[in-house]
């Protein structure tokens, strides 16, 4: 048989305080009741002996008497309550003061005695003369009466402070409006300057030179950016030199065959679509699907035309092309300098001077006779000596083709030097009597001789020694 479950409810144990009251006198208390009620547990002992050297700031930690430790508790400062100041919202009116004398009656009459009206028909009026007269007091002074009015004392003080927020304040306009043009006349308006205080700040010009046609954005950036690097000579780029000059003009002929129906621009990026099986006219351009626009670079050997190509060597199932990049370049041949025959700018001399070993075919021929006396004169010129033959030609010589003098003394100038013969010839050289160019003795400019450029050295002082003079 299944045993019936015990439904006995366990009673709650009495609290430690209740057990302490009954078992303390009889001495039957459990060992944990007395220390718990008297505050003598292990935790209380730790806090009790530890609070001797540690101050917890009056937080009430522990089971002490609550005296605040050695220093005790510090009372909070108290302030004397003061009466709040009442500020009236509206100005107060002065009180109405009614003067009441000591002999006045306490009964206030609503109607004066002279205002009683007698009913009935009025009878004859009798005038009884009075034995006692009355005094009439008049004032001669015509000054108006001055009434003292008490001023209203108001203790309310109202102050207004205004602060300007520059974020929500419009700036002052300090420049005049632009001039207007109407019916062919130019109208200028006066300068409009506000009274607001302003500060003169030096302004800098950010854009120096700009072209209105080339401005695209509202704030163009001045200056030139450095040219971007092409990056044609990397490790992952194949370098291929193209010899065919058609690479410069029509590179499409090297990739595909000519299509007369379509001819695109050759200076832009070219894209090609190949079938599965194709053969390029040039084997270097096999599997090329894109040729970028040309770039001209300067090399040591000359100018180089470069194009960056993209290959499509492999295709995946998803249609993605895989291939490397190729740098095709073609070096342009240098242009040789043309040898141009130069013509002399100076007029030809009257005679052509050659060396002594040759025969001179001059511009003029002089027939020498037996009467001509030739004397040899040695003229020293620097380190070498030169023999100049001075010939005395008689006036009877015929067949002379020397050009005659034009009669004008033309100076060739200081920058043009005439050729002076330096070799020994059998003919007399034509040396002009006057200088070849004008010489200005008095002038503001001069040229120093190279020997004058040397800076003079500073002389070293030498001490003279004498027998009767002491030296230091």
From Swiss-Prot:
Keywords: Capsid protein, Cytoplasmic inwards viral transport, Disulfide bond, DNA-binding, Host endosome, Host Golgi apparatus, Host nucleus, Host-virus interaction, Late protein, Microtubular inwards viral transport, Phosphoprotein, Viral penetration into host nucleus, Virion, Virus entry into host cell
Pfam family, one: Late_protein_L2
Paired cysteines (S-S): 23-29
Keyword RNA-binding: no
Domain of life according to the entry: Viruses
One BP term from GO: viral penetration into host nucleus
PTM note: Highly phosphorylated.
Single GO MF annotation: DNA binding
Subcellular location: Virion; Host nucleus; Host early endosome; Host Golgi apparatus
A cellular component annotation (GO) from this entry: host cell endosome
Motif (Nuclear localization signal): 1-14, 454-462
Chief site of localization: virion
Keyword Phosphoprotein: yes
Job of this protein: Minor protein of the capsid that localizes along the inner surface of the virion, within the central cavities beneath the L1 pentamers. Plays a role in capsid stabilization through interaction with the major capsid protein L1. Once the virion enters the host cell, L2 escorts the genomic DNA into the nucleus by promoting escape from the endosomal compartments and traffic through the host Golgi network.
Family: Belongs to the papillomaviridae L2 protein family.
UniProt subunit comment: Interacts with major capsid protein L1. Interacts with E2; this interaction inhibits E2 transcriptional activity but not the DNA replication function E2. Interacts with host GADD45GIP1. Interacts with host HSPA8; this interaction is required for L2 nuclear translocation. Interacts with host importins KPNB2 and KPNB3. Forms a complex with importin alpha2-beta1 heterodimers via interaction with the importin alpha2 adapter. Interacts with host DYNLT1; this interaction is essential for virus intracellular transport during entry.
Protein name from the UniProt record: Minor capsid protein L2
Organism (species): Human papillomavirus type 34
Organism classification: Viruses, Monodnaviria, Shotokuvirae, Cossaviricota, Papovaviricetes
């Amino acid at each position: 048989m299944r045993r019936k479950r015990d439904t006995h409810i366990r009673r709650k144990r009495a609290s430690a305080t209740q057990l302490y009251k009954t078992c303390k006198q009889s001495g039957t208390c459990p060992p944990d009741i007395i220390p718990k009620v008297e505050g003598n547990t292990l935790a209380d002992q730790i806090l009790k002996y530890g609070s001797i050297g540690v101050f917890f700031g009056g937080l009430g930690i522990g089971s002490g008497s609550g005296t605040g430790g050695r220093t005790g508790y510090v009372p909070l400062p108290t302030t004397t309550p003061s009466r709040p100041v009442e500020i009236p919202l509206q100005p107060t009116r002065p009180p109405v003061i009614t003067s009441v004398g000591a002999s006045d009656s306490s009964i206030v009459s609503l109607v004066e005695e002279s205002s009683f009206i007698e009913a009935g028909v009025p009878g004859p009026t009798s005038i009884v003369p009075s034995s006692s007269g009355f005094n009439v007091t008049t004032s001669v002074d015509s000054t108006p009466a001055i009434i003292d009015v008490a001023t209203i004392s108001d203790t309310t003080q109202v102050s207004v402070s205004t602060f300007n927020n520059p974020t929500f304040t419009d700036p002052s306009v300090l420049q005049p409006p632009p001039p207007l043009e109407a019916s062919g006349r130019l109208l200028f308006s006066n300068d409009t300057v506000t009274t607001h205080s302003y500060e003169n700040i030096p302004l800098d010009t950010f854009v120096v030179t700009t072209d209105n046609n080339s401005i695209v954005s509202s704030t163009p950036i001045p200056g030139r950016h450095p040219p971007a690097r092409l990056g044609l000579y990397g490790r992952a780029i194949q370098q291929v030199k193209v010899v065919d000059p058609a690479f410069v003009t029509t590179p499409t002929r090297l990739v595909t065959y000519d299509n007369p129906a379509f001819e695109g621009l050759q200076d832009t990026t070219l894209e090609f679509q190949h079938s599965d099986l194709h053969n390029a006219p040039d084997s270097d351009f096999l599997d090329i699907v894109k040729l970028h626009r040309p770039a001209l670079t300067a090399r040591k050997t000359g100018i180089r035309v470069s194009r960056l190509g993209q290959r499509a060597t492999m295709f995946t199932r998803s249609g993605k092309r895989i291939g490397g990049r190729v740098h095709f370049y073609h070096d342009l041949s240098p242009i040789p300098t043309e040898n141009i025959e130069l013509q002399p700018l100076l007029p030809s001399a009257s005679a052509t001077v050659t060396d002594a070993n040759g025969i001179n075919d001059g511009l003029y021929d002089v027939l020498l006779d037996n009467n001509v006396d030739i004397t040899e004169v040695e003229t020293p010129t620097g380190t070498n000596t030169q023999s100049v033959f001075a010939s005395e030609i008689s006036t009877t010589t015929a067949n002379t083709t020397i050009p005659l003098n034009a009669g004008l003394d033309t100076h060739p100038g200081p920058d043009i030097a005439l050729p002076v013969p330096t070799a020994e010839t059998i003919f007399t050289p034509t040396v002009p009597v006057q200088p070849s160019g004008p010489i200005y003795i008095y002038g503001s400019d001069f040229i120093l001789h190279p020997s004058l450029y040397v800076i003079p050295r500073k002389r070293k002082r030498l001490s003279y020694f004498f027998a009767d003079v002491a030296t230091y």
